[in-house]
Amino acid sequence: MSILEKVQPIETMLPERYYTMSTEDMEKRVREIKEKMGETLFIPGHHYQKDEVVQFSDAAGDSLQLAQVAASNKKAKYIVFCGVHFMAETADMLTTDDQIVILPDMRAGCSMADMADIEQTERAWKELTKLFGDTMIPLTYVNSTAAIKAFCGRNGGATVTSSNAKQMVSWAFTQKERLVFLPDQHLGRNTTYDLGIPLDKMAVWDPYTDSLEYEGDIEEIQVILWKGHCSVHQNFTVKNIENVRKNQPDMNIIVHPECCYEVVAASDYAGSTKYIIDMIEAAPSGSKWAIGTEMNLVNRIIQQHPDKEIVSLNPFMCPCLTMNRIDLPHLLWALETIEKGEEINVISVDKQVTEEAVLALNRMLERV
């Protein structure tokens, strides 16, 4: 657990009785508590959540959308965030001090966010400054810890989403000659390449060996990518695309930019979760789509569009395992403890970290 968080769990593990309750009984109790608490309770649910959880969300969206919606809701005392840890952190930083953000299962982390910790990042910045001097600006994907957002805030940088990455990267290059992009190398590479920066002007910082990997002239490096990735989107391959092209050549292929450069380059379309949802929504009836993103979302899109032929780009894809930590039993547990006047798994980010992280968030929000 990060020292930047102050968590007050009543119990650290889900009580046994929730394992023996029927789905019907759990759903009934959630509805009862939601009705009883009314506007004092707000449940945001990420697109990648299970249907058993999403059915109770008061808003569905990507991580930043949900944090903003939570921040605009001044009536809710309790925000039970159905997503992963960094999302709940962002919600806590953007909401008021008297609003309480709860994560139903503290094990719901994000492997990509965990690939850049603050000690590694501070060390990397020091080493890169020796190489490049005061020519760099940091940008972090919102899929990062509060500490990394704060690092970017105090070093003149900002956050980005997969929807606005191009705008924010363009802005960053008006501030400095070089960009340090973390923690997702793939989103950084795909975005900067789309903006015209060649691959040989990009380097990768490996935080485990404290080394810079590059092929071109070091003096010409414009982008330094953190060696991190999404464990879900990493599993989509060019071979998957080749199989679809061979077996169903009339199928459109659309992927998330967290996929690697080779997969994005071989696809027909690439964009954020919202972009993918909107594209399928607007597509004509009878159209065919292979989607390269998280499986819970793909399955939901399939259910919502029976008039279209939709498959996962990778037929053996699994849902995001950490996102799947949030399930109906954990949601009910969180709600019942609130009902009893208790609080579990409260997310509370350190005040100074919040101030610096909000700087980075606001630099983005002011420009998009």
Curated annotation (Swiss-Prot):
Where is it located?
A: Cytoplasm
UniProt-recorded Gene Ontology molecular function terms:
4 iron, 4 sulfur cluster binding; metal ion binding; quinolinate synthetase A activity
- Mind telling me which InterPro entries this protein's record contains? NadA, NadA_sf, Quinolinate_synth_A_type3
Give a Gene Ontology cellular component term annotated to this protein: cytosol
Which cofactor is essential here?
A: [4Fe-4S] cluster
* Keywords (A to Z) from UniProt: 4Fe-4S, Cytoplasm, Iron, Iron-sulfur, Metal-binding, Pyridine nucleotide biosynthesis, Transferase
Pathway where it operates = Cofactor biosynthesis; NAD(+) biosynthesis; quinolinate from iminoaspartate: step 1/1
Q: Name one Pfam family in it.
A: NadA
The EC number(s) this enzyme carries: 2.5.1.72
> Binding positions for iminosuccinate?
H46, S63, Y141, V142, N143, S162, H256, P257, E258, T273
Top EC class of this enzyme = transferase
Query: Where on the tree of life does the source sit, at the highest rank?
Result: Bacteria
Predominant place of localization: cytoplasm
Reactions listed under catalytic activity:
iminosuccinate + dihydroxyacetone phosphate = quinolinate + phosphate + 2 H2O + H(+)
Where do transmembrane segments lie in this chain?
none
Q: Which residues bind [4Fe-4S] cluster?
A: C110, C230, C320
The cofactor remark states: Binds 1 [4Fe-4S] cluster per subunit.
GO biological process entries: 'de novo' NAD biosynthetic process from L-aspartate
What's the stated role of this polypeptide? Catalyzes the condensation of iminoaspartate with dihydroxyacetone phosphate to form quinolinate.
The family line of this record is: Belongs to the quinolinate synthase family. Type 3 subfamily.
HAMAP family for the chain:
NadA_type3
Record protein name field: Quinolinate synthase
